[in-house]
């Protein structure tokens, strides 16, 4: 059953200001209750769902600004929900997983999630990551030098910086908001190597004190290569700087 309640009443929400709607999906009622209470106390509207099917119904009905999504759930697990959502939306997704294996944790990222946290997790850290992702989503402008320059071209790739859209050989390539921001950052400074930590700060908005897993960056780079490179195993655009990070090795041209 999809649930929505307002902790603290209308007066408190008006005082804090509505920061957006978050969909919390978890089959554990205690986790749903804790997250809903904490997030509403700091100004978010929160809707909860207890399984994957409810989550998809809630998304279609409410179009939330961000989703906190558990992996292990009845009916349809978090992986399945993430796959379905990515067919129609680039809404930020933070996955929660109790699975101990690193490969299991990374699977959600490979399916299009923006970030993940392992259970048990710190609610305060989750709140911080939510703020970071929503801030990046709401503020589409970046410090990147190419922002709003129009259409940029590299071989058969076209990047419309105004519409935040990418095309390959004339076909639009669907990118999540994080994937686009990552590509834009690297393309802004061709040849410049960015460490994983710098990318987490620039793209995810995390500060150095946040102990985010840098493998999040690696998985998103892999997803970009799969979508943009003719041969992802031997990339021509996004290269690895050994022992450092990643860089974009080609200089884009403005389309006139």
Can you say where each PLM-predicted feature lies in the sequence?
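Short, Lys/Arg-enriched segments at the junction into DNA-binding effector domains
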Residues: 18-21, 131-193, 197, 248, ...
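Conserved acidic segment of CheY-like receiver
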Residues: 18-30, 35-39, 67
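Receiver (REC) domain active-site loop signature in two-component systems and cognate sites
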Residues: 73
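Short hydrophobic/Thr-rich beta-strand motif most characteristic of the beta2 strand and flanking loop
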Residues: 43-50, 58
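Acidic catalytic/metal-coordinating carboxylates
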Residues: 51-54, 77-80
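Positively charged, aromatic-enriched patches within helix-turn-helix-type DNA-binding elements
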Residues: 165-177, 181-236, 241-244
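Active-site beta3 strand of CheY-like receiver
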Residues: 62-68
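Basic, amphipathic DNA-recognition helix from helix-turn-helix-like DNA-binding domains
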Residues: 27, 83, 87, 92-153
């Amino acid at each position: 059953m999809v649930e929505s309640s307002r902790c603290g009443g209308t007066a408190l929400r008006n005082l804090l200001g509505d920061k957006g709607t978050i969909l919390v999906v978890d089959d554990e009622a205690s986790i749903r209750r804790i997250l809903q209470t904490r997030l509403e106390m700091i100004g978010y509207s929160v809707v909860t769902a207890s399984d994957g099917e409810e989550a998809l119904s809630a998304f279609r009905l409410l179009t939330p600004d961000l989703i906190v999504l558990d992996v292990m759930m009845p009916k349809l697990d978090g992986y399945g929900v993430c796959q379905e959502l990515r067919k129609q939306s680039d809404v930020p997704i933070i996955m929660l997983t109790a699975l101990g294996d690193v490969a299991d944790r990374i699977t959600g990222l490979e399916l299009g999630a923006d970030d993940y946290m392992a259970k048990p997790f710190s609610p305060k850290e989750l709140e911080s990551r939510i703020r970071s992702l929503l801030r990046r989503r709401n503020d589409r402008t970046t410090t990147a030098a190419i922002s709003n320059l129009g259409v940029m071209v590299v071989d058969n790739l076209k990047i419309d910086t105004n519409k935040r859209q990418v095309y390959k050989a004339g076909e639009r390539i669907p990118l999540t908001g994080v994937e686009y921001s990552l590509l834009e950052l690297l393309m802004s400074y061709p040849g410049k190597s960015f460490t994983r930590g710098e990318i987490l700060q620039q793209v995810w908005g995390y500060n150095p004190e946040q102990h985010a897993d840098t493998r999040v960056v690696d998985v998103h780079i892999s997803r970009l290569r799969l979508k943009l490179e003719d041969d992802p195993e031997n990339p021509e655009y996004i290269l690895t700087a050994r022992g450092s990070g990643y860089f974009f090795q080609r200089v884009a041209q403005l389309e006139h």
